[in-house]
């Protein structure tokens, strides 16, 4: 399945509130497996939320919160 992926890395440091945002088109049948592969097994916590138009995955990795929004 082809998705538009918005990957946002949230920065909670008090002196740097900028966010890193990456947008790309990806093809995958399993968004959670895609995220696990992308973050190379460094995930401390993974939450998956199905939406009518896609999937949102929150991953805590190396102390940072990554939000992956897969939209059809």
What are the functions of these language-model segments?
Residues 3-5, 26, 35, 57-58, ...:
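Hydrophobic beta-strand residues in large extracellular and virion-surface proteins
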Residues 24-43:
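Short, basic/low-complexity N-terminal boundary segments at the transition from targeting/disordered tails
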Residues 20, 32, 66-68:
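Short non-domain terminal segments
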Residues 2-29:
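N-terminal acidic leader/helix
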Residues 40-72:
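Short, mixed-charge low-complexity intrinsically disordered segments
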């Amino acid at each position: 399945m082809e998705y538009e992926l918005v990957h946002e890395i949230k920065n909670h440091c008090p002196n740097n509130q900028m966010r890193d945002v990456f947008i790309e088109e990806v093809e995958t049948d399993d968004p959670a497996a895609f995220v696990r592969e992308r973050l190379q097994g460094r995930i401390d916590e993974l939450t998956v939320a199905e939406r009518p138009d896609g999937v949102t995955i929150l991953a805590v990795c190396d102390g940072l919160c990554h939000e992956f929004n897969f939209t059809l």
